[in-house]
Amino acid sequence: MSHDQPAYGLWLLVILNSAIFILFAFSFFKPATARDWRTFGAFSAFIVALFVEMYGFPLTIYLLSGWLQTRYPNLDILSHDAGHLWSTLLGEKGNPHLGVLHIASYFFLAYGFYLLSSAWSVLYHAQREHALATTGPYARIRHPQYVAFVLILFGFLLQWPTLLTLAMFPILLVMYGRLAVTEEAEMRAQFGDDFERYAQRTPRFIPRMGNGLTTG
């Protein structure tokens, strides 16, 4: 991208992209409880922080500009492509959108949104019947929606890493982990032995080997 066409300061794109992905996730997740809104709010904050740096103000590039110019003297740090830091650090040439990690990110994003949607469908019907969700992705792991959010966030980190989102990511992991524990305490109180048996046979976040995370 040439300097005649600004790479940053595109605040309309910040708003549009943030709104698209937040509303897209909202349509799948449909938060209903205070815990749901905390989960979704943290995800939304990550998305906004990401697109602010992607199209608004490149804080990470600004803070690393001295090191980047010394390490990569031919790098045009004012170009949009320079924001794809993994591509730069790995020494990839050409269009960064065709880089290995960028392509991998599409799979994380696509599967994350797919898992989020599939998990919500199972959970919705279980809640209507006042039953424990144990089918679909819930047959493989106990918290597929939290895993879905993590996959989506990780996918975005592969596309456009920033200092702020890299710092937020482990914090969100801890937050989602604690929310999962709180949720399980409530499920244990509500469903008793049924939940205990479910928890014994179903891992919390990572499916057992040979028991792939599917939605069937």
Question: What does each model-found stretch correspond to?
Answer:
Residues 1-134, 152-186, 190-193, 197-216:
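Membrane-anchoring alpha-helices and their flanking helix-loop junctions
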Residues 134-140:
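Helix-loop-helix units of permease transmembrane domains in multi-pass membrane transporters
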Residues 140-147:
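Histidine-centered phosphotransfer motif of kinases
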